[in-house]
Amino acid sequence: MTKIKEIKKVLQQEDADAAWITTPLNIFYFTGYRSEPHERLFALLIPSNEEPVLFCPKMEVEEVKQSPFKGKIIGYLDTENPFDKYSKTFSKMLIESEHLTVKRQRELTKAFNIEHYQDVDQSIKDLRNIKSEDEIINIKKAAALADKCIEIGKSFLKEGVEEREVVNHIENEIKKYGVNEMSFDTMVLFGDHAASPHGTPGDRKLQQNEFVLFDLGVVYHHYCSDMTRTIHFGTPNKEAQNIYNIVLKAETEAIKSIKPGVTIKDIDKIARDIIEEAGYGDYFPHRLGHGLGLEEHEYQDISSVNNNQLEAGMVITIEPGIYVPHVAGVRIEDDILVTENGYEILTQYEK
């Protein structure tokens, strides 16, 4: 319940009576219980001076009781109004404005006589930004399993194999290691198809002397990994190899700069300057990276407009890329833990 204590500190700082959390991943973050309730109400109420209250469909109550959550559980039937089961008045409520619908907010106002709302999204992002020891352990395991996925995929490469065949093989084989969920749709792209940064694997067949781009991640105990490797099948042409070398240098130098106190936009600049000086600046169309945790893309953006500083306990990706249509697409991505004195690279597959 340490994380709930942290959000209660936010309530005190903002002079608010309660927080209303409805994003399933944020509810999991604070309670240890995960659910996807679809259209049904699933919400965590955190009053400033009372125990937390979890609203959930009645059919999930026994599951909640088996979870780490310690607080009041309000289960309701589909024919019942869950707000009828809890009577309190809160003058000021913190809400996830990025997630809460207008309809739900009207219901809250009526149920709890709320006079004022304030956004809590950023406060939760700040909490999730710094990982606990347990979270780091899970992300490290997810990263190791992502390494295994690349190994599985590379060993399956052969002339004439289709992109989607490789995807299916990776996802089937990694299940043997206890993986039930990928972080996102696995991407395997051949040759200049990889010049589309978010291309969709299809029936393109692998030919000799092409690059193969793998972008994938694994979920382990709810935590994600996200890595990219670009591997040559045969001998790439001179321009493609040059592009690869530039991207590798950009990633290597950016990672070397990582430590607490470094301004995030400066890391992006290191990689971007290398790519621009090589003449490929127009072919690097995305940010350098992002946060990683319960979601494969989360706070913070590693970008040229982020003036925040790195802190120990953050887990981020570094993923420069160059995408030249009809020539080649190269991206290299690693998961990085910011440590007290520098960094630790969590994804270890060779480059």
Curated annotation (Swiss-Prot):
Residues binding Mn(2+) 1: 226, 290, 319, 333
Entry EC number(s): 3.4.-.-
Cofactor(s) the protein needs: Mn(2+)
Keywords associated with the record: Hydrolase, Manganese, Metal-binding
Pfam family, one: Peptidase_M24
Enzyme class: hydrolase
Sites where the protein binds Mn(2+) 2: 215, 226, 333
Keyword flag Metal-binding: yes
Metal-binding keyword on record: yes
UniProt GO MF annotations: hydrolase activity; metal ion binding
Cofactor note: Binds 2 manganese ions per subunit.
Domain of life: Bacteria
PANTHER family: AMINOPEPTIDASE (PTHR46112), DIPEPTIDASE YKVY-RELATED (PTHR46112:SF10)
Family statement drawn from the similarity comment of this UniProt entry: Belongs to the peptidase M24B family.
Protein name per UniProt: Uncharacterized peptidase SERP1271
Species annotation: Staphylococcus epidermidis (strain ATCC 35984 / DSM 28319 / BCRC 17069 / CCUG 31568 / BM 3577 / RP62A)
